[in-house]
């Protein structure tokens, strides 16, 4: 029994360390020509338009080449599909920025929004000229629960 407890503790520590290092590797700094305050302010302005149902205004904010592949309805569907069941909007719990060089260099304003039933993560990507080039939204699920942990650990030990 003592050996099983030690093995479980070691496995847990290894999973926690792997999770932390994976999260650190995923983030890049904003491009040199962009600053956090500007990216967050632009992101919050568009976030407010989305939450107010001003989808046509948000559509108009996208860079022309991106807008060519979108419709007002696609923007509306994306947001409403993620917020419809989330309840009433209560506010921003967390806001931060990251950079990315995937596709092209850009900055991302990330918002974790509190709703009465669920939290929703909304990310807005801007090119260095501060034109909107991307939007994503998704219900924020907890990355950890006791039942998930015990299920994962029981799989390690054949149980």
Question: How should each PLM-predicted stretch be described?
Answer:
Residues 15-19:
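C-terminal motif of bacterial Sec signal peptides marking the signal peptidase cleavage site
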Residues 11-12:
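Repetitive helical segments and hydrophobic/amphipathic motifs
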Residues 21-52:
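Short, low-complexity N-terminal intrinsically disordered segments enriched in polar/charged residues
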Residues 1-8:
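Bacterial N-terminal signal peptides that target proteins for export
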Residues 96-159:
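Exposed beta-sheet edge and beta->alpha loop/turn motif
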Residues 56-106:
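Short solvent-exposed beta->alpha transition segments
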Residues 55-56, 131:
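Primarily extracytoplasmic ectodomains and periplasmic/lumenal surface modules that are beta-strand-rich
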């Amino acid at each position: 029994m003592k050996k099983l407890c030690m093995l479980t503790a070691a496995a847990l520590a290894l999973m926690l360390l792997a999770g932390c290092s994976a999260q650190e590797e995923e983030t890049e700094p904003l491009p040199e020509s962009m600053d956090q305050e500007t990216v967050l302010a632009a992101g919050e302005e568009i976030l407010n338009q989305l939450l107010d149902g001003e989808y046509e205004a948000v559509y108009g904010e996208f860079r022309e080449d991106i807008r060519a592949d979108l419709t007002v309805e696609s923007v509306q569907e994306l947001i409403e599909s993620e917020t419809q069941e989330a309840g009433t909007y209560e506010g921003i719990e967390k806001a931060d920025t990251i950079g990315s060089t995937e596709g092209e260099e850009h900055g991302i304003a990330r918002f974790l929004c509190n709703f009465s039933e669920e939290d929703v993560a909304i990310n807005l990507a801007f090119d260095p000229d501060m034109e909107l080039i991307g939007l994503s939204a998704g219900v924020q699920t907890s990355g950890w629960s006791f039942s998930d942990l015990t299920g994962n650990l029981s799989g390690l030990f054949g149980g």
